[in-house]
Amino acid sequence: MGRLERQLMEAYIRQKRASPGMVQASDLQINRPMSGMRSNSRELHAYDGPMQFISSPQNPDQILSNGSPGGIAPATINTSRNHSNNMRSLSTINQEADLIEEISSHELEDEESSPVTVIEQHSAVHSANSTQSQRPRPRQHSFSDTLDEDDYTNRNVAAAAPVRPAGVPSSPYKEATLDGSSNGTGNGTGGESEGDVIGNIDQFVMQPAPQGVLYKCRITRDRKGMDRGLFPIYYLHLERDYGKKIFLLGGRKRKKSKTSNYIVSCDPTDLSRNADGFCGKLRSNVFGTSFTVFDNGNKESTESPRLDLAVIIYDTNILGFKGPRNMTVILPGMTEDDQRVKISSADPKQQGILDLWKMKNMDNIVELHNKTPVWNDETQSYVLNFHGRVTQASVKNFQLVHDSDPEYIVMQFGRTSEDVFTMDYRYPLCAMQAFAIALSSFDGKIACE
C-alpha cells in the first residue's frame, strides 16, 4: 500500500470512528469553516468525505503528509470571479472518490484504534438547542437469542468531530456532577469529595463507594506480546494528584472458554483463579449480550457461596438501527447501613439477580440504564457531557443513571486515547463492579451492532 493509500485509509478510519453510532463528548468544540460567510467569495468544501482532511488549504491538488504544518484542515476553493481558475475538475474528484472507495473496502482489526484530533474547549452553547435536537434510538428489549453483526462492522461514515459544551445542568441529587463540583461549574467546590484507597486493596475494591464520594479511575489496555492482540490485559488505576495513580485491579480474558470469561485480580503479576489476589470474574452468554459478575466465592460451598455482584444486559439490534448501544445494569440492593444485599445464583435456595429481574421482583435489586445521548444536528452525531473526562468518540462511551434521577451519574466510561479510558464511579458501585461493567464494554457482541 503506497503513501497516498495509507493517508486515505487513515482519513477514512477517522471519519468512520466519528459515525453516528458512536458517542462523542459534548464539552468539546467543532470548527465551522462555512459559518458567518454570506458573500460571493465565501469558501466551500472541495471534498465531501475523507479527502478534505488531508488536502492542502492553499493548493487543493496537494496532499498533506502526516508531518505537514498546519494540522488537519479542509481543502477549500474560492468562488469569487477573480479566482475561478482554482476550481477542481469533476473528473479529478471522481478519480479520487473511486480510489477512496477501493481503499475503504479493506477492513482493519480495530477500526477505533486510530487517533482522533481533539479540538480545544470553548464556551457552552444554549441548552435549548440540545433539547430540540434530541433524537434517541429506539430501544430493543430482547437480549439473549439472536445473531447479528459483529462489534466492528456495518457502521456508516459521517463527517463529525468533538463538539462544544452542551450546557448540561447539574444533578439535583446532592447537587453534584461527575467532575466533583456543584452546579456543573467544575470548580471543585461542591459537597462531593474525591475518593482514596482505605485499608487493604482486596477489601477496598469490594466495598461500595460511600455516599458523597467520587472515584476517578483510569483503565489501560495492554495489547503487547504474542497473543494480547486477541487477549489483552486491562489495568485499573485510581487517579491521584500530580499524575500519580494507585493500582486497583487487573483483568484478562481466559483463552480456553466456550464463552467470554474474564478473570479479575488485585495482583497484577498473577491474573489466575488460583491467585491470592483473585477477586472475581465476569462471564457472558454465548451471544455476548448478557454478562454476570461474580465475587471470589466458591460455587460449591454452602457456608460462603459465590455471590452475584451485577448483571449487564446489552439490547440486541437485529434490525440494524444506527445509534449507541443500549445497556441495562442490575445490581444487588443496598441495606440501611449501605451494604449490598447478598444474592447468589449458586445457592439453590434463592434466585440470582438475572432471575429476579426477569420475574420483575425488584425488592432487592437496582436497575440502571445508560443515559440516552443527545443527537447533535450540527455534527450529525450522538453526544454526552462527560465534563472533560472523555476526549474521543467511541461506541464504548456511556454513562449509567437510574430512571428516577437521570442527572445523578452512577458511572461513566469513555475513551481518551487508543488504549486509555477513564472510568468514574460513585455510590452504590464498588471498584470491582465498575471495572467488570467496563470490561463487558470491551468484549465483542455479535448481536448488538
From Swiss-Prot:
* PROSITE patterns xrefs: TUB_1 (PS01200), TUB_2 (PS01201)
What residue spans carry the region label Disordered? 123-197
Q: Which Gene3D superfamilies match?
A: Tubby Protein, Chain A (3.20.90.10)
**Disulphides:** none
Which InterPro entries does the entry mention?
Tubby-like_C, Tubby_C, Tubby_C_CS
For whether the record's keyword set contains Cell membrane, the answer is yes
> What residue spans carry the Low complexity bias annotation?
154-166
Its keywords, alphabetically, are: Cell membrane, Cell projection, Cytoplasm, Membrane, Nucleus, Phosphoprotein
Sorted alphabetically, the Gene Ontology BP terms of this entry are: protein localization to cilium
Sites bearing Phosphoserine, chain numbering: S142
Give residue spans, biased composition: Polar residues: 124-145
Q: Where in the cell is it found?
A: Cytoplasm; Nucleus; Cell projection, Cilium membrane; Cell projection, Rhabdomere
Q: Where is the composition biased (Gly residues)?
A: 183-192
Any one GO cellular component localisation term in the record:
cytoplasm
Q: Does the keyword Cell membrane apply?
A: yes
Q: What family does the Swiss-Prot or TrEMBL record give for this protein?
A: Belongs to the TUB family.
- What name goes with this protein? Protein king tubby
Q: What is the lineage of its organism?
A: Eukaryota, Metazoa, Ecdysozoa, Arthropoda, Hexapoda
